[in-house]
Amino acid sequence: VTDRIWRSAQPAPRHLRALAARGVRTVINLRGAHPYGAYWLEQQECARLGLDLVDIKLKSRAAPTVADLARIREAIAAIDGPTLIHCKSGSDRTGLFCGLYLILREGVPVAEARRQLGLRYGHIRMTKTGVLDHFFDHYLEHNAREPIAFTTWLDTVYDPAALTASFRSGRWHRRAARGRGLGQRCARSQP
């Protein structure tokens, strides 16, 4: 993402050791605290290495709530030093967070920052996770009609329910919901 912000899928303890050796001081886990083995291993290894572990539970197939965005903004404001950001696959939730980081901390334009949600990272827009792309698109559409700063839009205009309704009315979501998304089309084209 930047020279101080890295993204990944769920790290194993050996990955955390390698990152700590490279100077990473904070790990932001977008899966939230949970009782599964991967989280327990991550928690134990972060404690052993002296890494700060920040847990934020986000959903990959739902518009971020106002509370989600408040937690994300708080975490972004608190980043001080090399940081790893991850979810399960490093694609969807991580892409949303990294895009927001670039906008809020680095001043990157929204149209550029939204590229953190891309096929390069394993994110596929034409599935239910496309709601995260729609989040950025929704702002860009509003800003084209009525110019507004991104943070002002978040604070005064953003409505997760309206965003979700708008996304569900879209063509790609309807195809994915009926099982006719990209995966089904690719499967049908195989000999």
Language model features: what each stretch is:
Residues 87:
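Short cysteine clusters
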Residues 93:
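Active-site adenylate/phosphate-handling loop in enzymes that bind or generate adenylated species
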Residues 1-83, 96-191:
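Cys-dependent protein tyrosine phosphatase-like superfamily
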Residues 90:
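Substrate/cofactor-recognition hotspot
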